[in-house]
Amino acid sequence: MSKTVRTLALGGLVLAGLSACVSVPRGQGSGAAVVDHVSDSARQAEAARQAWLQAHPHWSFQGRVAISKDRNGGSGRIDWQQDGPRYRVQLSAPVTRQSWVLTGDTTSGAGRLEGLEGGPRSGPDAEQVLLEATGWTIPVNQMPDWVRALRIAGAGAARVDLDAAGRPRTVQQDGWTIDFLAWTPASAEQPELPQRIEARSGEAKVRLLVDQWTVSP
C-alpha cells in the first residue's frame, strides 16, 4: 500500500470514529461585540488576566471538539493536559469507543500520535504528523495559547479585535482566524477563560466547546 493510500485510510478511520459522536453544540450565550474603544480599566484587567495565566503553566480542560476540512469532518470528546511546554491531548469517540492520543512539546514542536491502525507515528513536527495521519490541519503548537486567549497580541498576530472587557474577540494569526464566542466566568480559583472558540483557515475549521477548566496552583 502506498504512503498516500495509507494516509487516506488512517484519516478515514479517525474521521469515521469521531463522526459517530454528536456535533459540538453552540455554547450558551454569545460572544461580546467588537468595539472601537476599550477603557483603561478593561485593558488593565485583561493584562492582569494574561499575567496570571502566564504564571500558571500547568492546566487542563475537558470538552467537545469538531474538526472539518473540505467535506470531511467529525466530532468527539477532547481532554487536553498541559504541563509547561509539554501537552497530552486525547480525542475520543464514545459511541465507537475509539481514542487517539497526541503528545508533544511546543518548544521543540515534535509530537507523537497513538491509537492509529498500524501503530504510533512520531516526528519533529507534531502538526505534520497529525496532517499526514489524519488529513487534519490543526495548529497544535499555537493551541495552548489560543485556547486561553493568551499572549496573542504579542505573538505576531496580524489583527486582534477586542470586546468591551478588553478580551480578544477575533484574532488573525498565522493564516488562521480565531473567534472567541463565549467565556467562562471568573472564580476565586481562576480568571475568565474561553468557553467556545472557532478557528478556521481556508477549508479547515476547528470548533471547541470547553466543559471544564482546571488550572493548577
From Swiss-Prot:
Keyword Magnesium on entry: no
Give the record's GO CC terms. Answer: cell outer membrane
Report residue spans for region: Disordered. 105-124
Alphabetically sorted, this entry's keywords are: Cell outer membrane, Chaperone, Lipoprotein, Membrane, Palmitate, Protein transport, Signal, Transport
| Keyword Membrane assigned | yes
Question: Lipid moiety-binding region for S-diacylglycerol cysteine?
Answer: 21
Q: Where in the cell is it found?
A: Cell outer membrane
Q: Name the lipidated positions (N-palmitoyl cysteine).
A: 21
**Family annotation (Pfam families):** LolB
Gene Ontology terms describing biological process: lipoprotein localization to outer membrane; protein transport
Q: Where is it chiefly localized?
A: membrane
Q: Which NCBIfam families match?
A: lolB
Q: Which family does it belong to?
A: Belongs to the LolB family.
HAMAP family, alphabetized: LolB
The subunit structure is: Monomer.
Q: What is the protein's known function? A: Plays a critical role in the incorporation of lipoproteins in the outer membrane after they are released by the LolA protein.
Q: What name is this protein filed under?
A: Outer-membrane lipoprotein LolB
The species this protein belongs to is: Xanthomonas axonopodis pv. citri (strain 306)
